[in-house]
Amino acid sequence: DDGELYAFITKENAPGHFPYTAGVFPFKRTDELSARMFAGEGEPERTNRRFHYLSQGQDYVRLSTAFDSVTLYGRDPARRPDIWGKVGNSGVSIATTDDAKRLYSGFDLCNANTSVSMTINGPAPIILAFFLNAAIDQQVEAYLAEQGKPAKLLDTAYRGELPEGHNGFGLATVGRRGDEMVDADTYAEIKARTLQTVRGTVQADILKEDQAQNTCIFSTPFALKLMGDVQQYYIDHGVRNHYSVSISGYHIAEAGANPITQLALTLANGFTYVEYYRSRGMDINKFAPNLSFFFSNGLDPEYTVIGRVARRIWAVTMRDMYGADERSQKLKYHIQTSGRSLHAQEIDFNDIRTTLQALL
């Protein structure tokens, strides 16, 4: 009846309409079944081979980068022989821009069908700089090839054989700097175009690190300043397709929080970033679209509505408290099945647990 219809419109609403309880977009994408497997092991070339294996036959390249503990804590593996056993363990070792060039070589980082996720927090601004410079230098390489002046690969560009599907793109600038290979005006043009095109996400959520995971390498105030500096750089250079932070509840849940506490702390962290960025004079509609979220899933009943509640709270607050526009009101998130829920005992049931979480 009319009453039920009114209740649906005001409380449930249709996808793509404020407050986006049922979804921020009116329709589900039909051109892609997104697959983004977390990957990272050993040296950059080894993970690069893994990336190419995972991307075989895929129309859309979705790379999710796992870094080793040495990288997560911002250490230089070349200077620490005492931690040799940790280098490349459970993630890829990245310490230079050349490492990033090798890691993502063979993938056009400016292709509209390519997106890169990087799970890094403490040293996130530095790793992000490696990534962006790798993307820029890729386009310098492409420009030189178009001009009939292809750069010659150095012998040290890539250790080992190129994997299947690897065309060598991105390796010609290994050991070189793109700004030294073209004139200043050309480089500035390539850089501007690259920054406005490159797609992906860097986690960089330092508040949840303090609360749950603790891969902090700076004090919280200084880490927040770095986050603000990165976001201001995004605004100044028109970086619109790359998310400067993935505000994460997953790690909070893995540390022991129930679904309600996970959501409360994650939204609180998100609004803290909003307040901090605004205190630095940033326009909310220029930075809010660069914020993304990441939640854990489990078998608790509250997980069935965690995304719906999050979208609604975010949309109402952004509109009514901050006067944000429609794009800024839309909370976009990724959700992942819980590792904490998996047991060593009766391990065969873990497949069932994960399947049920995925269905939720």
Where are these regions (language model features)?
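Flexible, glycine/threonine-enriched loop-and-boundary segments that flank and lead into catalytic domains
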Residues: 315, 338-350
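A generic alpha-helix surface/boundary motif
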Residues: 129, 312-313
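Catalytic alpha/beta active-site cores
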Residues: 1-306, 321, 329-336
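Long hydrophobic segments that form regular secondary structure
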Residues: 307-310, 318
